[in-house]
Amino acid sequence: MATDGASCEPDLSRAPEDAAGAAAEAAKKEFDVDTLSKSELRMLLSVMEGELEARDLVIEALRARRKEVFIQERYGRFNLNDPFLALQRDYEAGAGDKEKKPVCTNPLSILEAVMAHCKKMQERMSAQLAAAESRQKKLEMEKLQLQALEQEHKKLAARLEEERGKNKQVVLMLVKECKQLSGKVIEEAQKLEDIMAKLEEEKKKTNELEEELSAEKRRSTEMEAQMEKQLSEFDTEREQLRAKLNREEAHTTDLKEEIDKMKKMIEQLKRGSDSKPSLSLPRKTKDRRLVSISVGTEGTVTRSVACQTDLVTESADHVKKLPLTMPVKPSTGSPLVSANAKGSVCTSATMARPGIDRQASHGDLIGSSVPAFPPPSANRIEENGPSTDSTPDPTSSTPPLPSNAAPPTTQTPGIAPQNSQAPPMHSLHSPCANASLHPGLNPRIQAARFRFQGNANDPDQNGNTTQSPPSRDMSPTSRDNLVAKQLARNTVTQALSRFTSPQAGAPSRPGAPPTGDVGTHPPVGRTSLKTHGVARVDRGNPPPIPPKKPGLSQTPSPPHPQLKVIIDSSRASNTGAKVDNKTVASPPSSLPQGNRVTNEDNLPKSSSPQLPPKPSIDLTVAPAGCTVSALATSQVGAWPAATPGLNQPACSDSSLVIPTTIAFCSSINPVSASSCRPGASDSLLVTASGWSPSLTPLLMSGGPAPLAGRPTLLQQAAAQGNVTLLSMLLNEEGLDINYSCEDGHSALYSAAKNGHTDCVRLLLSAEAQINAADKNGFTPLCAAAAQGHFECVELLIAYDANINHAADGGQTPLYLACKNENKECIKLLLEAGTNRSVKTTDGWTPVHAAVDTGNVDSLKLLMYHRIPACGNSFNEEESESGVFDLDGGEESPEGIFKPVVPADLINHANREGWTAAHIAASKGFKNCLEILCRHGGLEPERRDKCNRTVHDVATDDCKHLLENLNALKIPLRISVGEIEPSNYGSDDLECENTICALNIRKQTSWDDFSKAVSQALTNHFQAISSDGWWSLEDVTCNNTTNSNIGLSATSIRSITLGNVPWSVGQSFTQSPWDFMRKNKAEHITVLLSGPQEGCLSSVTYASMIPLQMMQNYLRLVEQYHNVIFHGPEGSLQDYIVHQLALCLKHRQMAAGFSCEIVRAEVDAGFSKEQLLDLFISSACLIPVKQSPSKKKIIIILENLEKSSLSELLRDFLAPLENRSTESPCTFQKGNGMSECYYFHENCFLMGTIAKACLQGSDLLVQQHFRWVQLRWDGEPMQGLLQRFLRRKVVNKFKGQAPSPCDPVCKIVDWALSVWRQLNSCLARLGTPEALLGPKYFLSCPVVPGHAQVTVKWMSKLWNGVIAPRVQEAILSRASVKRQPGFGQTTAKRHPSQGQQAVVKAALSILLNKAVLHGCPLPRAELDQHTADFKGGSFPLSIVSSYNSCNKKKGESGAWRKVNTSPRRKSGRFSLPTWNKPDLSTEGIKNKTISQLNYNRNASLSKQKSLENDLSLTLNLDQRLSLGSDDEADLVKELQSMCSSKSESDISKIADSRDDLRMFDSSGNNPVLSATINNLRMPVSQKEVSPLSSHQTTECSNSKSKTELGVSRVKSFLPVPRSKVTLCSQNTKRSSSSSNTRQIEINNNSKEENWNLHKNEHLDKHNK
């Protein structure tokens, strides 16, 4: 025990000594604290603080033990039990005190020594630290002071520089101002001299003016004297003229008295003739008279207005106007007319045509609707001619009323205006017999009517039967000789027989004009003939012809003389006439709808209209007494005009009173072709007989129509186009063919004005005066040009008519043609060489007239039509080559030809100072103004007499056009520079794109120009990155500066204006407009920042990948160094990697590093050794002994999918992940030497894989790289194609985005949908290797107007790329689970029949479902292109009863054919039948699958009711010709895809059907044979959707698995399985049970994607 205690004791005492020794050594070791830095002092302080804390802990521990040690030391020696103390005691007693050291030293002394030493050290450290801190503070204060002094020094230096600059500017300004002031002083001195010189000149002029003024005063005094003398002479002449007027009035009074005497003689003669015996006419008809009452409206104007036509209704007001028809008895107080004459009252021409203003806008030739009234004190008789208009006549007339005839009935509105033209209004007495179908008919007319209508007692057009009593001759004794009367009878009979023979069997049209007048618009006007003096007495009618032999009798008979009675002109307008002992008042002429004066006895009693008879007329010609037989057709109606000229009716005034139905040739404005060219629409027979289309209104009058003298007849025949009558008259001798009426209208003028080309040709052949002008100076050429009768114009020009003749108002034929928009006439006149610069009295030129109408074609002809080189021989080829396209297509003619009109003509001002541009701008004719502006000599700043420019009077549209008049349209293009190299998938990426055209005006400033460029770029970026088709106008309201792809105005690197560089905000001394013109800048090019600048903006614009994503990719490469991009083939992986490498290279070079890009293409033969050599040669792998270089290396490995990643990169994974010398890797070179290498930290490795997903051993590599997946259904690939194609369309349309309904947009959207639907279907099929990136679709052609080009391109893409990939993918999947003997390669080379069938089915489904669906081409065009697609129509053959081990007898079943062509029609469905093959026990035990019979209807008809459709079947017998489970899975997926609601319904593509064909398999087991006759399917409401084309059901039993495919008529495709539920197995149900019709359908299947190994065999669950 003592030994243990002794061995322990020295240990306790040695520890304090060691501690004290260590402390002493530390104290002895001196070091200089002053040499330590601040950080070292802080570290020392922290160490010492830690040491002090440790020592404090030791002290505390020692204090705890002190008490125990003290007691032990003091009292331990007395403890006899302790052997240790005993030894100590012996030791102390054995030697001297000085030589002995206590065995156990007192710890307190040791502790106190330690504490004292620590305190000393602490005090010393504190002092040194305080000194160091004070020195540090002092140093920092000095540094702050120094910085403050430096800043102050800089400020003072900057202020000094500013002051110097300011002083320099002030000095320069002072120098400049001195120069300017000195120059101004010199200018002022010069001006002062000029002003003094002008002052002297003005003084001289003032003196001269004063002298001239005094001379003018003298001359004015002399002229006043002369005027006084002339006034006295005028007074003398006035007195003389008054005396002469008095004499004339006396003479007129004498003549009136003589007229009264003549009237009395006429009455006596009539009494004598009435007393003579006549034919069997009832006696009382002698006493019936109809008076013609004239009601004047101004002055002494009188009009004798009568009508002998049927009733006319006014459909506009639905008010029936009856003219005054009054039977009167002979009376001495009032003059009477011949028996059964008819009278009608019309106060004025305005009352005859109230409120009709159809042609007022036609200018000179087609004037206002107010007719010209005759001068006062002129007696006028309205000639009895039809006056037709396009609206019904407001004035109506009634048929004559014999005493024994039924009262007339008003005509219903539904009959008269059948052809938008009322029956004619006749305005003259008919001094002849009454109308046919009434008693008192002229026998000659009745004879003609007999041939025309058959029996007089036959029902008329409305079924009314009127009796015709024997007519009598109502003519008095004739003064003509019998020979003349005999000749007249013969000629009239022949003419009537010619006229009536073609019309014998045809019923006449009730109350309607002939078809020839349909569509014509004759203006309204007056129909009058002026009388001079006494009315002439007619020579009477020809003698009658017996009724039994109509038209053949030659027996003469004395005719009746016919007298015209003019009512005295002094009668007032409100005079009443006493008729039949009843006074009928004439209402005032101011009534708006005309006067309605009706005899109470003659009111209509029936509602059925009274229709006129068949036409038959007499033509009486004057003085020679020879009656000419012809039929004169009438198109009568005056032509009102606001200005004089071409507004008077032809032959409206005549010196003769002509008792005839054909009053004159009216001024007609024909519009329809038939009225312009009557011969074109009439039959040859009608034309030969003289019948003109406008004859019917005349012939409907119902009474005879005798004519007057030959000159008047000539004019009438020419005006009415009666070639027969005209030729007969021209063959007579002594006829003046140039005779003109009072208005100056000749026969040639009338024919030309009415467009009767044949009559014009006859008159010109007869040498009529071609340039004879009327009283207003209008020639026949003027009339024809104004009316648009271009054939007449051409004929007149051929006969050398004066084409530059100017009327009294200065109107030339060219001016009139332009005024009335007659393009053909303008063209003919210009080709004839007419003068385009002739001006009217108002200062108007033809250009003014053309612009005033707003007719662009007329203006283009005037400005650009050139005179042919060969004069009038202007053939069609020259016209086609020299005359431009009036429609103004893309090839603008004015861009090819220069205007032929001079600038003076364009800028000519009329009387008000208005140019043609003023007129076009004020009326808003923008097209005309644009044509004028294209003339280089136009002066838009010319002012009118009110000091207004064209811009001042223009409408808003025209103001905008004028503001852009001289604007430069310069295309703005975006350039991305060179895209290199082309093998990176950048073939289809365009380098330049036109985004818009900038309008640069004269007033455009550089600030406006900068804003326009920035806004155009922003709008373009937003438009191409939007979801829909936006135009640039649609995005201007969007204020966002950044587009979806991240580009903005800040992405610009530089801008060039032509070849001059420019930056946004920069200004030149010239304005943008002047700058562009001077430098001839044809385009503005914007260059985007690219990889050369370390940016990716140009890459974003070229590839349409958003900038944010590209920047993120670059960040990943810089951060991880190892990045692989993978996605479907064609996802632009190579392009992205190369552009990222370029950008990274330039960034590193900008930072001062050298950088190199190394590219390697990997193929199947690329080995690991080759990759090692690549890494070593590029200094990416560095030997451990070698020091690294500062060079940066970028390695690109392309097409990594062609080799095994795990084999190729396995040895490099670890050193790539840990790049340092601490983790080297040993590699063996090709020469057998091995060495340690490590990867350089400055090496970047990027790779590309054209594969949608990794599989198998390649997944081992995945964790060692950073992967970027480019999915087709996610950004950036999802929207890349849409953005790219939209940009291509915008570029094709020169920056203008078309509307969404444009065919180009539709075909582009179709191409986009094809890519999306194709990938969607391929993903559902579980063939990701067949997915396509957007690269293949970037080359989609955009050809406006040629959508078939895109379809042809799609067919080539389908046949060359898509179909082979799909075929390979389907075969690859179908052969994965083959038996060992059938490998994948063998399956691809020699596919089985089942695999071929599946491939063909897949191709057909994809084609119809993804490609052809949605094609915007019409069905007919699409049918033509369908055959170009591979797999569009195929027979799918399925072998029945196939066994997996070997073939049984059931394998000889027939092949089923399913034609998926959507183009064939088929009939009804045949009832599908089910057949079970004869299956051996072994076949049932093995894995079995039913035979797949595609009983298909290839119909894509429209949606029908599902309950009424017969279902289609999918027969799956015990073994399919498919060789594996995956083939069956593919079939099921194809079926499911056909019925998927998420996919497009191919039923929308076509509308055809195929006959359902059924092939029975060789089944011998009758028990397993089942026939389902009425297979129906209960479908929920959700199933009836346009996208769900198939629904299926599945059933299984204990024996075999049978698939029942129940489909709608909509689809011909295989039936899906994913949407059905399996029926529970029912052993009680036999296979022949018909209960399989009870089917449930699962609509909730959300399954859309299939994996490769997902579906197992159908019967595995039964095992």
Swiss-Prot record:
Gene3D superfamilies registered for this protein in UniProt: Ankyrin repeat-containing domain
Positions of modified residues (Phosphoserine): 1524
Compositional bias segments (type: Basic and acidic residues): 1645-1663
UniProt KW Phosphoprotein keyword: yes
Chain residue ranges for the region called Disordered: 1-23, 203-222, 358-440, 454-479, 498-616, 1447-1477, 1581-1602, 1618-1663
Bias type Low complexity, positions: 386-396, 1624-1638
Bias (Polar residues) ranges: 411-422, 583-597, 1582-1599
Role of this protein: Regulates the dendritic spine distribution of CTTN/cortactin in hippocampal neurons, and thus controls dendritic spinogenesis and dendritic spine maintenance. Associates with the striatin-interacting phosphatase and kinase (STRIPAK) core complex to regulate dendritic spine distribution of the STRIPAK complex in hippocampal neurons.
Protein name: Cortactin-binding protein 2
